[in-house]
UniProtKB/Swiss-Prot annotation:
InterPro entries: Costars, Costars_dom, Costars_sf. The gene is cosA. GO terms for cellular component: pseudopodium. This is Protein costars. Modulates actin dynamics and cell motility. Disruption phenotype: Cells form smooth plaques on bacterial lawns, produce abnormally small fruiting bodies and display reduced migration towards the cAMP source in chemotactic assays. Analysis of cell motion in cAMP gradients reveals decreased speed suggesting a defect in the cellular machinery for motility. Cells exhibit changes in the actin cytoskeleton, showing aberrant distribution of F-actin in fluorescence cell staining and an increased amount of cytoskeleton associated actin. There is also excessive pseudopod formation. It holds the Pfam family Costars. GO terms for biological process: regulation of actin filament-based process; regulation of cell motility; sorocarp morphogenesis. PANTHER family: COSTARS FAMILY PROTEIN ABRACL. Belongs to the costars family.
Length: 82
């Protein structure tokens, strides 16, 4: 599976699991994303996909990398619907 496909699937999961804010952007807590069974079954390396999506300007989150438990309450925000 290629990174572009994984990023597109990540966008779908953020929209499915997240909520749309007043600014029209979807966001989801990292812990919700990480602990979802469908997400866990789809992504071999969720952190790598998140980093790739952030580098492409599709999502944003505070910090460079997200770790389970430590960053469970960090918002992953969808910037572009691609």
């Amino acid at each position: 599976m290629d990174v572009d496909h994984e990023v597109k699937e990540l966008v779908k999961f953020i929209k499915k699991l997240g909520t749309k804010g007043a600014d029209g952007k979807y966001s989801v807590k990292y812990g919700v994303l990480f602990n979802d069974d469908d997400v866990a079954n789809f992504f071999e390396a969720l952190v790598g996909t998140l980093k790739a999506a952030k580098k492409r300007g599709i999502i944003t989150f505070q910090g460079e990398i997200l770790l389970q438990r430590v960053h469970d309450n960090v918002d992953v925000i969808l910037l572009k619907d691609e």
